[in-house]
Amino acid sequence: MASEPYADRDDPRHFRRNGYLPIVSSSTYTTTSFTVSRSLRCFPSVLLVLVLAGCAGVKVTAVSNNDYLAQRRGDVLTTGNLSASAVAALQVVGSDEKRCLADLPACREALDSTTGLRDEQRLSTLAELWLKEAQDGGKVMAAEARTDAYLESARYAYAYLFLTTRTPSQRALEDRQTQVRDYYNFSVQQALVEVFDRYRGRPPSPEDTQGNFRLKTGRWTIGGRMTDVRLADDRLLPKELIPAASLSFGGLRNQYRRDGLGAELVAVTAKRVVSKGSDEIPWSETPFPAITAVARFPGETLEQVLSTYQVEVIGYDPYRQDSVDMAGVQAPLAANFTSGYGLWLARSGFARQSLLTLVGRGEVLERPHVYLLQPFDPDRRIVVMLHGLASSPEAWINVANEVLGDEELRRNYQIWQVYYPTNLPLAVNNQAIREAIEQTLANFDPQGTAKASHDMVLVGHSMGGVLSRLMLSSSGDQLWDAMLGSYGMQGARLEKARAKLG
C-alpha cells in the first residue's frame, strides 16, 4: 500500500484506523506515538498472570471449639497421635509424623543431634516419642523393652520439667508443660505397675528393714523405698500396685484427687477386707492404701541425667504430704483420695456379712471390729463412724468419701469405721465397741500422748447414734447401786456378779 501523505496523518481518524494514539498538545497534534497492537494481543496473558498472582496460598476456614481444643491439646495420651508441638519440632529436622514413626531410632537421633531446637522442644518431643513407642508396642513388644521405653519417656519428661532454663513456675500456664507432666506421671505409673506385675505375689525382697529395694529390668536399675507409707501388717512392700486412674466406682457421687506430680496408685497388701483372721484382733488397717510414687533420676546436669540408667522410686502417703522436692524444685504431689476407699468398699463383703449376722448366721465378724481407712497418723484427730441396724460401714459410703475429699477435713481428721453385730443388746455392743477402740489406740499409741488419742469424734446413724450417745455418757455407780438395792446380793453371789458385769 502506498504511504499516505504526512498531512493525512495529522488527521485523528488516521491514527484510529492504523492503531496509533496521538498525544495532544495545547495547539496541535504531535507526531509522538507508540504502537499498541502487540500490547493488546498480550493483554489477556498479562491479565491472567495478575489474577493468578492474586490467589492466596493460605485459605482461612472456621474451626469448631472441639477441633480447636483437639488441635491445641491432642497428643499421644488423648488422641494416639503426636501433638502439634511434636509435629512442629519434627519439621525443623526435615521430617513428619509418618516418616518419624516409621523409623523411631533414626528420628530420635536426628532430634537429639540438631541445633535448631531449644532444649524444651527437643526434650518434650523425645518424651512423647518414647511414650508413643511404649504404647504402640503393646503385647508385641517384650515386657522389659516396654518398661525401658516408659522409663526413657519419664527421664526426658523429668529433664524437661526440672533441668531446662525455665522453671516449672515460669511455664505454669503453658499447655505443653501440662502434657509433659502427664507423660511423666503416666510413664512412671506404667513402669512400676509392669515391674510389680512381673513380681506378682513375690515382690522384690527389701534390702534392709527400712524397706529399701533394688531390682534390674532391661537396661535399667530401679532402686527405691516405701518408708514414707505405712502398709498393713507391717509389710515393707505391697503385693500389687493398681493405677488409680483405672478404677471407676458406681455408688460414689464424686471422686476426689489432687493435681500434681507422681503416679497415683493403690498399694494392695491383701485380697479382701474381711477374712477368717478378722476376728483375732479388734482392728484392721486398710489393705488398699492410696500412695503416690515419684521417680528421680540421679545427676545434677542435663547431660548426667540423660546418660544414666538408674532411677530412684519413692512412695509417699498423699494424706500426709502434699509436695515433694524434685531437683531442688518444690512440686505439688499428685493424689487420688477416693481410689483406696472405693476399692476397700468393693472388696469388703460387708453387705452380705451384716445380713448374716442379723439372723445369727455370721461366721467371721461376731464382735465389733475397728477399720482404719488410712494408715494411722498420730497428728490427726479420729472420726469414728457407727452404722445402724442391719447395716455395715457401707452406710457411710458418700459421707466418708466427702470427708476424705475435703482438704481442710482431710488435713485434720482420719476416719475409723466400726463394724458391730446389730443382733446383740445395746449394752453388750457399747462395752465391746469401747474395748475395741481402746485396744486399737493402745496398739498405735501405747503412751497415749498423740493428738489422735484425744478429743475423738463419734458419728452414729440409727442404732449407731444411740451407741454413740451411750459411749459418751457415764452413770457412775448409779446402776450398780440400784441393782444392789433391788437384789440385795452379798458374799459369793456379789463377787460373781461383779466379775461377770465388770
List each model region and its residues:
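Serine-dependent carboxylesterase/thioesterase catalytic core
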Residues: D112, L131-S205, V383-L389, V418-N423, ...
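Bacterial Sec signal peptide processing site at the extreme N-terminus
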Residues: A53-R73
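Amphipathic alpha-helical repeat scaffolds of TPR domains
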Residues: G74-Q91, E120-E133
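Bacterial N-terminal signal peptides
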Residues: P44-A53
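Short, surface-exposed "cap/lid" segments of acyl-processing enzymes
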Residues: P368-E408
